[in-house]
């Protein structure tokens, strides 16, 4: 069973692995099939699910909600995360993709997510990306309104720099619960830019998206040395796959990230969560780092 972890001081308790529904519309599941899939990953202990208003051209939340309408009892077995703050041209009124983090939009978006997801509350709402026009006071007003109304229990951000995180936190009477960021052997800037250090300092656990590099790990020739090293480490650890080793590499970080799994295949989810049992050494971790970036530590 997947470990459970409190992700921040006074924050929610989530499963250590998170089920990501970004690509739900690509899985071509009926509502009944989706119910079965949800039941299967809940049985594995993956109880936290990750959504965003824009996923699937604004369709993924509603598709998930249709499944919950068929099995409403499943809602009490899961924690639902969603995001807002990006507007895309998938909606006719948007002539250009842009960010929107004003008070009314955040509230309206969260309320629409509740309708779409067939639930009465979100366990966590995130601002999806930093907005150059973000007024931190307005965001704080929206968060406080949603909290007081009982519609959202906890709040966080995604893809924020430490300075952006600190700015928003300075306006809030409660602790931000997470910063959902890209962490992968093929994307390592956050390891040294202070993002994960800030979260470790605050005892806040990041959520990690694109752990497998959006497929680059498997199909980019540049990362062949990384694939080779992952295969060697997989043999050393008796791991089932190089994917499993990547998840173990992320779990080794002291900020204690929660990896988001983006697959609609239950076997891949099962393999991913088994990475918790792998004990990666410090030298194995640095071998993987070097294979990905192409050079040794200074």
Report residues per predicted region.
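Beta/alpha (TIM)-barrel catalytic core signal, keyed to glycine-rich beta->alpha loops juxtaposed to Asp/Glu
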Residues: 4, 130-298
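N-terminal binding-site loop/beta-alpha segment at the start of enzyme catalytic domains
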Residues: 1-78, 297
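Acidic (Asp/Glu)-rich catalytic clusters
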Residues: 8-11, 67-79, 114-118, 147, ...
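Alpha-helix N-cap and loop-to-helix initiation/capping positions
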Residues: 29-36, 59, 63, 97-105, ...
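Short, acidic/polar
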Residues: 28-41, 101-116, 165
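Structural motif corresponding to the early beta-alpha repeats
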Residues: 75-101
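CE4/NodB-like, metal-dependent polysaccharide N-deacetylase domain
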Residues: 105-126, 146-149
């Amino acid at each position: 069973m997947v470990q459970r972890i409190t992700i921040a001081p006074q924050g929610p308790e989530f499963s250590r692995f998170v089920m990501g529904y970004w690509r739900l519309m690509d899985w071509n599941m009926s509502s009944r099939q989706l119910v079965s899939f949800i039941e299967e990953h809940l049985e594995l202990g993956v109880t936290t699910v990750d959504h965003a208003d824009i996923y699937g051209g604004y369709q993924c939340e509603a598709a998930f909600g249709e499944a919950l309408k068929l099995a409403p009892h499943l809602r009490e077995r899961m924690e639902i995360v969603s995001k807002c703050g990006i507007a895309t041209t998938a909606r006719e009124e948007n002539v250009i993709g842009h960010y929107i983090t004003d008070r009314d939009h955040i509230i309206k978006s969260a309320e629409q997510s509740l309708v779409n997801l067939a639930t009465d509350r979100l366990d966590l709402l995130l601002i999806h990306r930093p907005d150059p026009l973000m007024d931190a006071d307005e965001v704080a007003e929206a968060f406080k309104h949603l909290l007081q109304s009982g519609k959202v229990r906890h709040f966080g951000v995604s893809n924020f720099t430490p300075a952006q995180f600190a700015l928003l936190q300075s306006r809030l009477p409660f602790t931000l619960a997470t910063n959902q960021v890209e962490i992968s052997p093929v994307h390592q800037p956050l390891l040294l830019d202070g993002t994960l250090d800030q979260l470790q300092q605050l005892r806040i656990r990041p959520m990690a998206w694109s752990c497998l590099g959006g497929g680059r790990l498997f199909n980019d020739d540049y990362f062949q040395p990384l694939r080779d090293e992952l295969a060697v480490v997989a043999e050393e650890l008796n791991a089932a796959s190089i994917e499993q080793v990547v998840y173990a590499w992320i779990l080794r970080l002291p900020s204690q990230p929660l990896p988001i799994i983006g697959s609609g295949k239950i076997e891949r989810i099962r393999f991913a969560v088994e990475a918790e049992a792998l004990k990666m050494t410090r030298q194995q971790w640095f071998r993987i780092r070097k294979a990905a970036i192409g050079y040794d530590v200074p």
